[in-house]
């Protein structure tokens, strides 16, 4: 989904890697307007999983089409963006990648992440992840993180910064003066980790000093 913030970040990363000379293919899961579920490689269908509950189950259990593609194309490195879904099936997937001699990098966008789960279903997913994540990471060469941690789940890290592609999002041309006031706008899905509460708390502290400069 091009409007999705996560999808945009992935696009920025793949574009940056291509600019560095890497041959990058993006494997992702797609749900069509007709309810069909597919594994995709860029714009091409890798595997049609069908529709309904059987397709949902296949998505979580069967990674054979991806493994076959990696072997057929001679892929040397697989970069996985973590969905906190370590389980016996994803462990089997990364173990088979290692058997093929593939280097595996796992990006964990937010770490630690245990506190991010609040609903009942999310806690079940987190419990499963806690049970299996160390076993999963045994087959991971490096964990990519935005944090300052040297090691995560026993694996060495590669520390990067979370940025944007200015070629896709140009700097805004100023149209209004900011000498008297500043208007802020939040453009995102509103989840607690986006920090809107911290912004409001900061504004409250700011206005507690009766400032002349107004921020809205």
Map each language-model feature to its residues.
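N-terminal subdomain of nucleotide-sugar transferases
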Residues: 1-33, 73, 142, 198, ...
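A short, glycine/small-residue-rich beta-strand->loop->alpha-helix junction that serves as a flexible
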Residues: 1-11, 82-87, 191-194
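A short, charged, and often flexible helix/loop element on the N-terminal side
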Residues: 29-65, 80, 120-124
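Acceptor-binding helix/loop patch of EC 2.4 sugar-transfer enzymes
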Residues: 49, 105-133, 165-167, 171, ...
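Membrane-proximal helix-turn-helix segments that form the acceptor-binding/catalytic region
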Residues: 64, 88, 92-100, 110-114, ...
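Short N-terminal targeting/anchoring amphipathic segment
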Residues: 67-88, 101-105
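Carbohydrate-associated surface elements
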Residues: 149, 163
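Conserved donor-binding/catalytic core segment of Leloir-type glycosyltransferases
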Residues: 175-194, 200-203, 216
């Amino acid at each position: 989904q091009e409007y999705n913030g996560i999808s945009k970040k992935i696009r920025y990363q793949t574009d940056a890697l291509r600019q560095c000379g890497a041959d990058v293919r993006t494997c992702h899961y797609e749900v069509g307007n007709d309810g069909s579920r597919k594994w995709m490689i860029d714009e091409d269908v890798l595997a049609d999983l069908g529709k309904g509950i059987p397709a949902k189950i296949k998505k979580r259990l069967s990674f054979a089409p991806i493994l076959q593609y990696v072997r057929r194309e001679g892929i040397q490195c697989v970069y996985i963006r973590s969905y906190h879904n370590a389980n016996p099936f994803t462990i089997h997937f990364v173990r088979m990648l290692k058997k093929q001699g593939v280097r595996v990098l796992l990006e964990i966008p937010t770490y630690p992440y245990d506190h991010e789960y609040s609903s009942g279903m999310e806690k079940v997913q987190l419990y499963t992840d806690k049970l299996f994540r160390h076993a999963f990471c045994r087959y991971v060469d490096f964990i990519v993180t935005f944090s300052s941690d040297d090691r995560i789940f026993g694996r060495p890290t590669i520390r990067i910064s979370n940025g944007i592609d200015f070629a896709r999002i140009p700097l805004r041309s100023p149209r209004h003066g900011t000498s008297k006031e500043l208007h802020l706008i939040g453009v995102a899905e509103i989840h607690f980790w986006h920090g809107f509460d911290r912004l409001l708390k900061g504004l409250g502290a700011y206005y507690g000093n009766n400032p002349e400069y107004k921020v809205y």
